[in-house]
Amino acid sequence: MFVLFEEAGKYLGGRVLSEAEASAQVELETGKRVKVKGANIVLRFEKPSPAELIAEGRALAASMDLDLAWEFAAEGEFGFADLAADYFSDKPSLAQQAAALFALFEAPHYFRRAGKGRFKKAPAEIVQQALAAIEKKKAIQAQIVEWAGQLAEGVCPAPVREQLYRILFKPDKNAPEYKAVVEASRASQRAPLELLERAGAIDSPYQFHWRRFLFENFPKGTGFPALVAPAIADELPLAEGVEAFSIDDSQTTEIDDALSVQGLGSGTVTVGIHIAAPGLALAPGSAIDQVARARMSTVYMPGYKITMLPDEVVDTYTLLEGADRPAVSLYARFDEATLELQSTETKLERVPIAANLRHDQLDSVVTQPWLEDGSITHEDTPAAAARFRPQLSFLHRLARQLKAQREVVRGKPENFNRPDYNFRLVGNDGAEPTGAEQVQITTRQRGAPLDLIVSEAMILANSSWGGWLGELGVPGLYRSQASLAPGIKVRMGTRALPHAGLGVKSYAWSTSPLRRYTDLVNQWQIIAAARHGKTAALAAPFKPKDADLFSILSGFDAAYAAYNGYQGGMERFWTLKYLEQQGITELEATVIKDLPNGALVRADALPLVFPVAGQQERGARLRVKLGGIADRAEGGGR
């Protein structure tokens, strides 16, 4: 005797060797012997063989009309033999019974199991939903096959193009677009990136890196919601006798800082460092704050930037010339002769901004000799530079002194051997680049007088405010460095600690609240300190050991690293483009590091580091012949 039985979701057949009350010993056609529970046996028969019965039953089941079978089936619970009798004939054959069993078992959208060989009809609405889902699945599979075929032929379907960066970097492996790429990649034996490049999905190397950056850091886009900058409610006093001026480049719209000098010739000079004060109007948790916190910083890249705050908000608080602007001011008093710091004071006030100086327009005029020797004149000296010449001269003298004092603490001079490089995309005018623009690269010597004036003033403000918050027990976001020993990096934390690299006792970023979120957070803390003094720790928005402050620190670190990494990658991209556009095939370079099979070199006149073949001593000067610049440009963001 043979039996058909269910085992682990399958129907198997075999010859009965022996049988007890509740089970049977069955030999399969493979020769394997198994113990089968009696309840799992659904058919007993003498002939044909189990293999023949199963094959005939499956073939017959495939021809059954499931809609008709569902109509014929009883409303209550029924067995497969009952359906065979209703569907085929009153006395169905063994093969017909097996066919009914297989059809019922393999159509769960029509019939639900009610036991071994027992079933119930699914409700009509469930059947319709299931059939619709099956049809949808078939349509999706057909679409996947069609898209995969197009990709293999070098054509990129629009839906795949729209999901390109998600497919490459954060795929939904159940999405049909992803499955189409996988199928096409398998069929064509090409890597997904190569496949998509060949299909024209990637417009250009620049667009690839740009869209990837946006996908990873701005998945919802770079636009802003509709926001209104709140007015500052405080009645702020006017800074009497102050004529402040900012020093930035011509592309800067987020003018965070300005300087003023009072008391020249009196023996005591007061230097004012005036910082834009969005913190006087924006509150932690407000809609604008949430936008700033999500971005953490303005993103800079050659020819373009993504601002932390909307232009309308920046315009409300920026230190634009010709008006009295709200500011958080640090006044530092110095002995005019010795330049010894005598005292500091913080004020919340309105500051008259007399001028916005632009160093790219003034660097050729405002030189160290011009600042130190009043007899030197230039015919083309801008009126603003001439107007503030005495103040700039004092600030430059002070900046050199402050730098020298820091270098004593630091233990060695700061190195300004390499210049800053400025990138300009011709005809871009601040619009989003395409990657095809003509690029100009110019240099600006680090430590130039105007640069030195601004940097030393900001270090003075950041270190003074950082120390003041620490004295009051008010937490902030600090940057510190334990020593200048190799491997000791700058870290961020919430406590005032020394910064060995700068040579200061503490350093809290506070001077760029329109473009760095850390500075806005610190400004809230500084405002609380200015208003409440010794009780500021109780009134400040962020308290000691505030979990939210640590969350901000962590988020800022991650965002700032990503933004700087992208900026560096794009500067490399445009440098390679510059080489290509200018037809430069050789570069003067200096070896900076040994590599296993060569050396790493830095170009002497461009912001470019690259490997060369052959062992070279560190510091050696080389003339390097370049090759494959166009290909390298495609890796600009790596």
Regions found by a protein language model. Give the residues of each.
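A short, conserved structural fragment
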Residues: 105-117, 202
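N-terminal basic/disordered segments at the start of proteins
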Residues: 5-9, 17-22, 27-32
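Low-complexity, highly charged intrinsically disordered N-terminal segments
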Residues: 143-243
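Electropositive polyanion-binding surfaces
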Residues: 10-12, 19, 31, 39-41, ...
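A short beta-strand micro-motif
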Residues: 1-8, 589
